[in-house]
């Protein structure tokens, strides 16, 4: 029996404040709007193109 694939859980990337939807993570500057960057302890990284921004 094959293992089940983990879902993307995109609902965790948004929150509602004052009746408006607010994005929690940044978009990738290379891929454009719609592709979120992953928030790590020391960096922001894009899983699609591999772009990385280091935190200071």
From Swiss-Prot:
Cofactors that this protein relies on: Zn(2+)
GO biological process entries: translation
Cofactor annotation comment: Binds 1 zinc ion per subunit.
An annotated Gene Ontology molecular function: zinc ion binding
Tree of life domain: Archaea
Alphabetized UniProt keyword annotations: Metal-binding, Ribonucleoprotein, Ribosomal protein, Zinc, Zinc-finger
SMART domains: Ribosomal_S27
Record GO cellular component, one term: ribosome
Zinc fingers (C4-type), renumbered ranges: 28-49
InterPro entries per UniProt: Ribosomal_eS31, Ribosomal_eS31_arc, Ribosomal_eS31_euk-type_sf, Ribosomal_zn-bd
Binding site for Zn(2+): 28, 31, 46, 49
Subunit structure and binding partners: Part of the 30S ribosomal subunit.
Protein family membership: Belongs to the eukaryotic ribosomal protein eS31 family.
Protein name, per record: Small ribosomal subunit protein eS31
